[in-house]
């Protein structure tokens, strides 16, 4: 599957739903999509096409999606890729986004457009998650697994780049600290795994699923009851409640978006 503007928007809408409240808004994803299409070509491959020993790397954006002081430049995508290749023992065959989300599903797209490395029709996790450990595909439970993470971001005096190796939790904490220093978030490559491990532990096919949801979403635009019925049929969902959001509280703390909302139901 080759990324186009139409396909990209379908993926963004579906990923916004699958993100489950995390992963940013489609507006942010659309800005990335436009930039990616102007930069190069992005092709999605099925992980089944890879040999068991080929290496997959995760692309992520770590930090606060609500930040207004963050800055990710094209050079940062190239830097994290070069640093990762310099420190990883095997060549990379594909890149995968860490999670669905209106913005986060685009993680890896710019890197793919710049380097030609294919994206996979998959994600580490089937929904958005706030910590690196949650999106580590169980690697944190493997005693001898050594995580490799490279991160870059920020502008002017806030610009920062790091390479970290160690446990999944330890390196993830280092990246989170870098996101705070960068003013909100950093672009990250992390946790190389074989295709064999990935097939058994990742959310394979979720990009195609997101696209399908996005197509139905567009067809039902403005007709909420029809959209809800379609989503329930597609995903075997249960509607827990419906009503107006009466209050929202959103704060940025330690590189996280932390918030609550109040839903008034009948």
Which residues make up each language-model segment?
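Non-transmembrane, aqueous-exposed alpha-helical and coiled segments at domain scale
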Residues: 2-15, 27-266
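Extended, polar beta-sheet/loop recognition surfaces of beta-rich domains
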Residues: 21
């Amino acid at each position: 599957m080759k990324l186009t503007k139409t396909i990209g928007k379908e993926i963004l809408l579906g990923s916004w739903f699958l993100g489950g409240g995390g992963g940013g808004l489609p507006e942010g994803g659309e800005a990335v999509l436009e930039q990616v299409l102007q930069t190069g070509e992005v092709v999605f491959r099925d992980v089944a096409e890879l040999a068991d020993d080929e290496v997959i790397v995760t692309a992520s954006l770590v930090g606060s999606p609500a930040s207004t002081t963050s800055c990710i430049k094209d050079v940062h995508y190239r830097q994290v890729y070069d640093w990762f290749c310099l420190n990883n023992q095997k060549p990379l065959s594909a890149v995968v986004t860490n999670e669905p989300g209106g913005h986060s599903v685009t993680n890896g797209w710019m890197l793919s457009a710049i380097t030609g490395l294919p994206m996979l029709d998959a994600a580490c996790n089937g929904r958005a998650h706030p910590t690196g450990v949650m999106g580590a595909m169980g690697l944190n439970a493997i005693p001898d697994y050594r995580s490799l993470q490279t991160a870059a971001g920020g502008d002017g005096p806030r610009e920062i780049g790091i390479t970290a190796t160690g446990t999944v939790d330890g390196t993830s904490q280092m990246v989170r600290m870098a996101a705070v220093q960068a003013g909100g978030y950093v672009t990250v490559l992390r946790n190389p795994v074989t295709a064999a491990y990935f097939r058994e532990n990742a959310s394979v096919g979720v990009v195609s699923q997101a696209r399908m949801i996005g197509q139905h979403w567009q067809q039902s635009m403005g007709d909420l009851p029809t959209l809800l019925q379609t989503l329930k049929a597609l995903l075997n969902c249960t509607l827990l409640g419906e009503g107006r959001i009466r209050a929202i509280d959103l704060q940025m703390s330690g590189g996280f978006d932390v918030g609550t909302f109040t839903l008034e139901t009948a």
